[in-house]
Amino acid sequence: MVDITNFFKKTNKADSSQAFNRVRINIASPEQIRSWSYGEVTKPETINYRTFKPEKDGLFCAKIFGPVKDYECLCGKYKRMKYRGIVCEKCGVEVTTSKVRRERMGHIELASPIAHIWFVRSLPSRISILLDMNLKDLERVIYFEAYIVMDPGLSPLHKGDLLTEEMLQQAQNEYGEDNFIVGIGAEAIRTLLAELDLKSLRNALQEEVNNVINSDFKRKKILRRLKLIEDFIGSGNKPEWMIVTVLPIIPPELRPLVMLDAGRFASSDLNELYRRLINRNNRLKYLKKEEDGVPGIVLRNEQRMVQLSADTLFDNGKRGKAVKNSNKRPFKSLSDMLKGKQGRFRQNLLGKRVDYSGRSVIVVGPELKLHQCGLPKQMALELFKPFVYAELERCGIATTIKAAKRIVELGTPDVWNALAKVIKHHPVLLNRAPTLHCLSIQAFEPVLIEDKAIQLHPLVCTAFNADFDGDQMAVHVPLSTEAQLEARVLMMSTNNILSPANGRPIIVPDKDIVLGLYYLTLSIDGEVGEGRLFGSMAEIHHALFNKVVSLHSKIKFRKYIINADGDKVMALVNTTPGRLILGELLPDGDSISFDVVNKVMTKKGISAIVDMVYRYYGQKATVVFADKLMKLGFKYACMSGISFGMDDMIVPETKSKHVNDTLLEVQEFERQYSEGLITSGEKYNKVIDAWSRYTDRVANDMMKGIAAGDQTSVGLTNQERLNSIFMMADSEARSSVTQIKQLIGSKGLIAKASGEIIDRPILSNFCEGLTVFECFIGIPGTRKGLADTAVKTKVSGHLSRKLSESAHGYFVKREDCGTTNGLIITAVVEGGVIVVTLAEQVLGRVAVSNVYCPVTKVLILQQGEMIDEYKVELINTAGINSIKVRSVLTCELQEGVCAKCYGRDLSTGKLVAIGTAVGIVAAQSIGEPGTQLTMRTFHIGGAATRGVEASSFEAIVDGRVKIINPNFVVNSNNKSVIMSRSCEVILADNVGQEITRYKAQYGSILLVTDGQEVTKGTALVVWDPYAMPIVTEKSGYVMFKDMIDGVSVKDIIDESTGIVNRVIIEPKQGRGEVVLRPRICLLDQNKQPLTLSNGLEAEYFLPVNSILSVEEGVNVSAGDILARIPREFAGTKDITGGLPRVIELFEARKPKNHAVIAEIDGCVKFGKDYKSKRRLILQPNDESHEPIEYILPKGRHVTVNEGDVVKKGDMLIEGSPVLQDILKVMGVEALGLYIINEIQAVYRLQGVKIDNKHIEVIITRMLQKVEITDSGDSNFVIEEKVNKRAVINTNKKLKAKGLREAQYRPILQGITKASLQTESFISAASFQETTRVLTEAAIAGKVDKLEGLKENVIVGQTIPAGTGFYINEIKKIARQRDKEIIAARDAELQENNTEA
């Protein structure tokens, strides 16, 4: 282990090449600072402005810091290497390299101690906590504003009391000057700190904390002080070291003084700060030496000045205003050198500049192979110069390096021959910024080209997110053999076929290639040669050449196929010549059926083929196939001649009809509103939905129209009638229905800059042109889209960084942890539609236990077996609903994760290799799409993309209905109204296997009965999407309670219609008044309260803003609506709303209007209300539990009624639940599944696929800390948040000794907090809040075990992931073997000595 302070050891004594595996940070003692120093700096001068030599004893003194020139003393007496190590007797300078001026330190002996500002001002202030003082009081003492009593002596004062000048005078007069001792400044604080007996203070505080019962604040304060004392005791630091008596001066080369032209100098700010400090310190020394005695006030002022100048040096601006230079810019202090993007950590240690690199614009290289890139000749020569020199020498063309250099400058043909030899099989790395994921840097073999732009293979554009509109890329040359080997094996473009985010091919053809293949595989009626029969591909090519058939002719072709029994038979296949040409590219073999290519190729279809080729034939075949596919696509894209003009933009004829129909609908809603049947909000929502349906209908008609092609022109063939715009959209090559809809349909609804949708759509399209008004309302949304792009790119980039920070130290450490835990995975259902199948989710996972077919009971999956594509098909056929799989969340390894719990490495399709940095892969996979999506927001041009609000569930297939918890009543219209909050409608197939399930809302209408057979499309449940009803369970007469006009209920008149609505408002109540709880009671004919099925009175409490639907005294039937609560849906759903949601989840923030969830199973009761809160009491079913009380805000709608039975985890108030509540109530697995589903819902909305395991990795990092609930016999403090691994290890030791173990509970931290509280202080300091992290780490004497990626990059060691992981493992084995050999040898020697 290396102590961070030992980095400053005198260089001639330290072995700089010594390997280390840990770094420790401590507070430096005065003795240690002196031991680093090569001499005291006593003068503020820097260099002599005449001779330009450093001044003796100044800030650049050569005697202290070393010679300015290599092996030359200052006076010039000793020059050259032969005098190395001699100290010149004249000038006192040691003859050595000038490099030592980067390492040697000096020091200042301070005339008065100063308090280190990090320990004073970094909140919470460490010195104030240790002395149990107020921060303001501490500062008053340090800055000479008040005296502190050090020893009360015989006076009634107390130790630590503060006295002003007047109070001190008064006390001295009263009690005598010698009867008590006071102090002032940092010196007094140092004395107090030195007097602390930490161990006895710890014991006293532990007793005190046990006695504190009532005050939570006091308890936390004591615990905080106790934790700090534990840190000091554990680290061996002394509290008085927080006060500096000797100040180190950093080496001069790290604060350079550079000479500019015209004799001026540019200097580092640190020199000026040190100069001020030395001047003030020297003045103070002089004043202290004065025999006549200097007035106390003058001395104290000078001491204060020294303290202030030290504060500025350590952290300028930490206290009060920052000190500025002559240009009104704040001085850059030592802290500023470390902090932020321009600080030492991020600028120089994590982001280094790279030599042997170049940069140029990229152009397309369609002639290249997938593993190649085109490198400009001049650029290659510059990059490979050393290799060229070596090659010229090796071939005997040049005798020396100098000669080789001259030959290269002349540019003779030999140079280019040498370059061609050198670059052969020497991969280069191409990088495109922003480097969002590992595929943004790939290796290629360079091909020399004459141009000045780098040529890039078209298929890797998706991975780089590159296009050729001026993008630039950087080239890097891997120099060492190991680097070249890694580049070739791990980073070659041919080895990066699959996306690490979702396991799908990423070298998939796009744009023109897709269009070319789509055109090639089209089948058109009436083409020449239709119906002909062919027997070989030679015949096909011959027929095409002679124009006997066209590419799109429907023909028959004789070929071998695999029949249903799996036998290879000859058969006639209906196909087209184009499809047969595509089929020729498939690798030889029968694994892929011709049916796969015997259809019109879209982007999805092509992707599926590439995926199949990879799965069945491996990597090499896929690379060859992809290259052939690209060339074929480009060829036929060119031959097709597809382009579009105004004639291709066919506006649907039905558009005006749809407009008129929708306008009639809107008028109907206006009428309902004016008659008071619906509220303004409901009308708005209905209008928005009507126009959304209109745009959908127009879009459908438009697509039908352009699909039919040009039917009006005469004399065209069917091929000529094809519509280019339709072909582009249908093939998924370019554009989307949304964009075409704006072009030739209707632009549709528009969102304001606020996100709210304007209820008047743009009916025109861009082909017809917009009216002035339409243009006007469309502008704000479009402009916001462009402005958002810039802002959201930044937000997404920051999310990526935070994710990487939290997960960078997470690797695969072992093959198997042996756990039997896992997550139960089911299909994801939204609105009754399966959006993600079970098969998609379990692919690449490992089964926890054996899985059998539910019908045949045949074993499908064995325990510990990885689920591949074949197994997925078996799961689909067997109709299995859920599978328990191994998960990162349930892995039992203390460090990292095991391969079995992680499952398949998505970038290779095999089980993940040990040493893979799965944390970084996860962070990149989640962060990269966020950036992509935010950048793509503006493509739709401000058009609102909100879907129509769902109002029913329909059967997605034929099947049988099964109803769970069917609590419903039949209303006056003979409809079944659901009264249960846990009613579910299940759709099962003929065998009884569940296909999907729908959660029916309270108040919705059930249209089917249990066991009923339904056909696809049958409506099962319907509800009002714009209002939540409050429904009566019994028939009876309505009576209002606590409804006082103007107090708890108000008649609101709609200004536009004059209709009066009775709305519940927040009751205005004074203190001591009766609490009003507006509700509707139901009475029987005798005016007696009715009783509900749960035995309680029929009372329905009304939340604020609910609208009454009944009058007092009317007779209502069971199932009738008493009141309704309007729902407001107005936002557009896209990643712009979704990205903040993702951040909210990963930061574990409390949602704005969060839900309250039931902690136990129980029965709901309402207690006495407070002024603005409602009291809900949950009476547990289990009598051993205490009832739980919830205080709920009155304005929010409570989803349960009195007497309702709720289950653990049920929502009591609607909203997004707080993640910490889910963890507390439901546990880690439930929390994991909730976060995964919420985040996936956001990405799914944009069509982005990310594997669940990446989200699981991040959640695991959020759950790495636990809170101590009972410290047992450990040194932990109650409520302390510590690493789970540390607690488990401590408990093992305690258990072995028979002592009480520490008890703990899991806690969830946001990714930022998790990054800052990581075990590595180097990693945390380089992320955020550098000064605070380093202060904490120094006090606790933290040890960084260098386990993550960042800390190893910072200290310049190989990262412990990938190849580095195996290097470390080999080193461990070697070290162990060395120990064993040495031990054996020692034992042998000892034995020999004994015999002798």
UniProtKB/Swiss-Prot annotation:
Where does this protein hold Mg(2+)? 467, 469, 471
Instruction: State the NCBIfam families in the record.
Output: rpoC_TIGR (TIGR02386)
Subunit and interaction comment: The RNAP catalytic core consists of 2 alpha, 1 beta, 1 beta' and 1 omega subunit. When a sigma factor is associated with the core the holoenzyme is formed, which can initiate transcription.
Lineage of the organism: Bacteria, Pseudomonadati, Pseudomonadota, Alphaproteobacteria, Rickettsiales
Q: Which cofactor does it need?
A: Mg(2+); Zn(2+)
Instruction: Please report the name of this protein according to its UniProt entry.
Output: DNA-directed RNA polymerase subunit beta'
Q: What is its EC number?
A: 2.7.7.6
Gene3D superfamilies in the cross-refs: 1.10.132.30, 1.10.150.390, 1.10.1790.20, 1.10.40.90, 2.40.40.20, 2.40.50.100, RNA polymerase II, clamp domain, RNA polymerase Rpb1, domain 3
GO terms for biological process, alphabetical: DNA-templated transcription
- Give the organism the record lists: Orientia tsutsugamushi (strain Ikeda)
**GO MF annotations, alphabetized:** DNA binding; DNA-directed RNA polymerase activity; magnesium ion binding; zinc ion binding
Where is the chain membrane-spanning?
Answer: none
Q: Which family does it belong to?
A: Belongs to the RNA polymerase beta' chain family.
Its EC top class is: transferase
UniProt xrefs under InterPro entries: DNA-dir_RpoC_beta_prime, DNA-dir_RpoC_beta_prime_bact, RNA_pol_asu, RNA_pol_N, RNA_pol_Rpb1_1, RNA_pol_Rpb1_3, RNA_pol_Rpb1_3_sf, RNA_pol_Rpb1_4
Catalytic reaction equation(s): RNA(n) + a ribonucleoside 5'-triphosphate = RNA(n+1) + diphosphate
